[in-house]
Swiss-Prot record:
Swiss-Prot/TrEMBL GO biological process terms: auxin-activated signaling pathway; leaf development
Transmembrane segments: 338-357
Reactions mediated catalytically: [protein]-peptidylproline (omega=180) = [protein]-peptidylproline (omega=0)
Protein name listed in UniProt: Peptidyl-prolyl cis-trans isomerase FKBP42
Top-level class of the enzyme under EC nomenclature: isomerase
Chain's role: PPIases accelerate the folding of proteins. It catalyzes the cis-trans isomerization of proline imidic peptide bonds in oligopeptides. Modulates the uptake of MRP substrates into the vacuole; reduces metolachlor-GS (MOC-GS) and enhances 17-beta-estradiol 17-(beta-D-glucuronide) (E(2)17betaG) uptake. Regulates cell elongation and orientation. Functions as a positive regulator of PGP1-mediated auxin transport. Confers drug modulation of PGP1 efflux activity as interaction with NPA or flavonol quercetin prevents its physical and functional interaction with PGP1.
Amino acid sequence: MDESLEHQTQTHDQESEIVTEGSAVVHSEPSQEGNVPPKVDSEAEVLDEKVSKQIIKEGHGSKPSKYSTCFLHYRAWTKNSQHKFEDTWHEQQPIELVLGKEKKELAGLAIGVASMKSGERALVHVGWELAYGKEGNFSFPNVPPMADLLYEVEVIGFDETKEGKARSDMTVEERIGAADRRKMDGNSLFKEEKLEEAMQQYEMAIAYMGDDFMFQLYGKYQDMALAVKNPCHLNIAACLIKLKRYDEAIGHCNIVLTEEEKNPKALFRRGKAKAELGQMDSARDDFRKAQKYAPDDKAIRRELRALAEQEKALYQKQKEMYKGIFKGKDEGGAKSKSLFWLIVLWQWFVSLFSRIFRRHRVKAD
């Protein structure tokens, strides 16, 4: 193991996860759950006789050159039936595409990617001749014969040939080192409030440590990889919370908690996202677990107080609502007051029972 890399990882340990207790507001991204191709109004750019592109979101910087290693997410559909047969966003694992060395069935996609900048999202139209051909593909992915395709593609970023080599040709030390550099670049961009660009760097860092790579690691190699990979997921979650994309933030926290179930930052950020979605009881459970593992954390105490205040405000609102209902029917009547307090008591009992049941279920799991 490269001793300098190990020292670098330890040196940056305190800086590896960004602090995000603020509430910057930036524009939201489109949903990552599309089952049909997006409707795009932009003019189609012809890239090849069989390939055209419509830009959904502009990128930044330069375009990749031949033999660049590109990291991207995409969804793919057959054009006629609009059957979605592949979705890398669903797996939360970007793919690697080396331009000029792509598989034959990805030739059309590669032409589209070569025309895109980092951060650009586009709808790429590919004729069957530059896709799965006359015979199609009957294993995975399942594509019928002579099928024209649609790709919704987002280029996360790319490495020029002069900067490095394909992940498969890298040693363990090189891959972890490359990922750590991307993570630190992401942290710098986050501090500048460039959230989308920061997430691209974190995604590229994660791309160096896919499931196939992590599966081969053990001992200190695994620990060093997780010390880079998990903070990237948490930092993406922090960006997504600022972008108000709460469901996606929860997904990245869940990935970390699969590896480290006692990670207080993952529990805290998941709780924060759940609270924003109105899942108060579940958010409280996450905050309390986080507090158990980080008892001195002021941010956790602050979120628990905020939840308690929200519940108190909701209780007062319900109280006033029921008062208004019964006041109209029986001004000052003893029966109305009794019924009101009976309803309030019943709601409290149901809420208490629900919490007890949830705690028992969590313990059982």
